[in-house]
């Protein structure tokens, strides 16, 4: 019955996995979208899961900690994922190669082959932040031809770019 109402009234659900290196801004983004305000966060050990409704889409967002010790556990969250949000700490030029490796490890997993990919180029408000075109190049996105991906500049603290990213997800998700 619920699926019938969804088809009639346009409500969709989408399972989103939010990944990125530690301190990229994943949890700040999650709670900015959920609560509309900035919250003080601590490093995520384990995961946070919240439902965010935007434009008649219920996003079930799984924010899993980014510390290197728990990254091997990420794959346990892949099944059923329809969209990947990968958050990049744009001023952190020293770890962009590490971010690229982790991104490609995720998207090359067979469980993630159908997921669309949104990159939040985060912390655009900070000096020396890499711009979206630079993130696109450094993450090797132009070589990904068989997947739908997009780089959205963002600032988790202010909320800039976050809803534009969700708009891209809603426009590009095929249920």
UniProtKB/Swiss-Prot annotation:
GO terms for cellular component: cleavage furrow; cytoplasm; cytosol; endocytic vesicle; endosome; filopodium membrane; Flemming body; Golgi apparatus. The keyword Disulfide bond does not apply. SMART domains: ARF, RAB, SAR. It is an enzyme of class 3 (hydrolase). Its EC number is 3.6.5.2. GO terms for molecular function: G protein activity; GDP binding; GTP binding. A lipid is attached at residue 2 (N-myristoyl glycine). A lipid is attached at residue 3 (N6-myristoyl lysine). InterPro entries: Arf6 (IPR041838), P-loop_NTPase (IPR027417), Small_GTP-bd (IPR005225), Small_GTPase_ARF (IPR024156), Small_GTPase_ARF/SAR (IPR006689). GTP binds at residues 23-28, 41-44, 63-67, 122-125, 155-156. Keywords: Cell membrane, Cell projection, Cytoplasm, Differentiation, Endosome, ER-Golgi transport, Golgi apparatus, GTP-binding, Hydrolase, Lipoprotein, Membrane, Myristate, Neurogenesis, Nucleotide-binding, Protein transport, Transport. GTP-binding protein involved in protein trafficking; regulates endocytic recycling and cytoskeleton remodeling. May modulate vesicle budding and uncoating within the Golgi apparatus. May contribute to the regulation of dendritic branching, filopodia extension and dendritic spine development. NCBIfam families: small_GTP. This is ADP-ribosylation factor 6. It comes from Xenopus laevis.
């Amino acid at each position: 019955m619920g699926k019938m109402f969804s088809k009639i009234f346009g409500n969709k659900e989408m399972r989103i996995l939010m990944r990125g290196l530690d301190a990229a801004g994943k949890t700040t983004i999650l709670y900015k979208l959920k609560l509309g305000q900035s919250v003080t966060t601590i490093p995520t050990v384990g995961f946070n899961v919240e439902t965010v409704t935007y434009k008649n889409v219920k996003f079930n967002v799984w924010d899993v900690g980014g510390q290197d010790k728990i990254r091997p556990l990420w794959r346990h969250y892949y099944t059923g994922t329809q969209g990947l949000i990968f958050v990049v700490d744009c001023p952190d030029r020293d770890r962009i190669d590490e971010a690229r490796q982790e991104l490609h490890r995720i998207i090359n997993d067979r469980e993630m082959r159908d997921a669309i990919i949104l990159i939040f180029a985060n912390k655009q408000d900070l000096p020396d932040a890499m711009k979206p075109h630079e993130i696109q190049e450094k993450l090797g996105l132009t070589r990904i031809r068989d997947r739908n991906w997009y780089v959205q500049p963002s600032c988790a603290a202010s909320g800039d770019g976050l809803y534009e990213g969700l708009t891209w997800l809603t426009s590009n998700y095929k249920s």
